[in-house]
Amino acid sequence: MTQDEMKKAAGWAALKYVEKGSIVGVGTGSTVNHFIDALGTIKDEIKGAVSSSIASTAKLEALGIRVYDCNDVSELDIYVDGADEINPERDMIKGGGAALTREKIVAAIAKKFVCIVDGTKAVDVLGNFPLPVEVIPMARSYVARELVKLGGDPVYREGVITDNGNVILDVYNMKITHPKDLESKINGIAGVVTVGLFAHRGADVVITGTPQGAKIEE
């Protein structure tokens, strides 16, 4: 089974958590694209979706799924999204696709976060994947200096502007043993919009695509 086939297995398995008549929170990325395809097969059974990115919105609308503004929805039953890394405590690094802030907002209004990944994303300690930080452009240099003080090596992600008009710093060489503490510290730096650590709001369900199919941990 290829990596993409494992992603597909995880994405389609998440359909079991979609309630009839509900509005579904939808993340961003290659694994989520498989979930969106799956969602398209039951589009007449759901009310619609709240999307975490312009890219996911376009894909949802192309399949005829109504996309609601996050401001018009007070609560979601589920939010389905991938991760760049996930540890045994279900803390995650997200933001490889630069949609981390909107992902964090949609996750915040969801009762249940269903994380869909392939087996390569599971780690014991977060930090091998560079940690994305969304930053207001004028604060980029200042935030980078502060991230160095926290032990990281920040690199400006050239040519990338987020859906919110901001820039991304990818922080390398961080062994993240206390994800909640680090999330709070980085979010406290002036000019940071958010960090791609999802520890205060981790996953509730993890669906992992494996060569044997989807493995579900609740």
Curated annotation (Swiss-Prot):
Its EC number is 5.3.1.6. Coiled coil: none annotated. The keyword Ion transport does not apply. Keywords: Isomerase. Substrate binds at residues 28-31, 81-84, 94-97, 121. Belongs to the ribose 5-phosphate isomerase family. This is Ribose-5-phosphate isomerase A. It comes from Vibrio cholerae serotype O1 (strain ATCC 39315 / El Tor Inaba N16961). The gene is rpiA.
